[in-house]
Structure formats: structure tokens, C-alpha cells
């Protein structure tokens, strides 16, 4: 089953995961300080949470099962 809107939410979630990884790498490399890193992490985590909640709500409204949701590649 393929659903463009759900796929878009999944892509947003995955983009947030990639951004979070990039932030962690830059922080570990000493390129951004702890305060900036914390703000970026919070912003990205908020984005991930919104994308996931939107995807769940969309799936419920359109009768997409939990099994079908799990079949999407979220990470």
C-alpha cells in the first residue's frame, strides 16, 4: 500500500532523524556549542514528534492499520 501523504510524513520524520544525527556529529566535532546544540535538538525533536503525530492521525482518519504504518520505513 502506498499513500503519498503518509509517505510525506515519513520523509519529514526521516529528515528530522538525519538532522539530529548531523547536529550530534557537529557537536562532537566541537563545531557548535552546547547551548546551540540543545536548541537545535529541541527544534528537531519537536519536528519529529509533529511528523509522527500527524502521520498517526492521518492513518487513523484514512483507515490505515498499525501494521501498514509499521511497514513504512521511518528511520
List the predicted regions and their residue ranges.
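Short, charge-rich amphipathic interface segments used for partner binding and complex assembly
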Residues: 26, 33-72
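Short, charge/polar-rich alpha-helical segments
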Residues: 1-17
Amino acid at each position: 500500500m502506498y499513500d503519498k501523504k503518509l509517505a510525506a510524513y515519513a520523509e519529514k520524520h526521516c529528515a528530522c532523524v538525519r538532522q539530529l544525527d548531523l547536529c550530534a556529529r557537529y557537536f562532537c566535532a566541537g563545531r557548535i556549542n552546547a547551548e546551540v546544540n540543545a536548541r537545535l535538538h529541541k527544534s528537531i525533536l519537536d519536528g519529529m514528534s509533529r511528523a509522527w503525530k500527524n502521520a498517526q492521525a492521518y492513518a487513523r482518519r484514512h483507515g490505515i492499520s498499525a501494521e501498514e504504518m509499521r511497514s513504512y520505513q521511518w528511520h
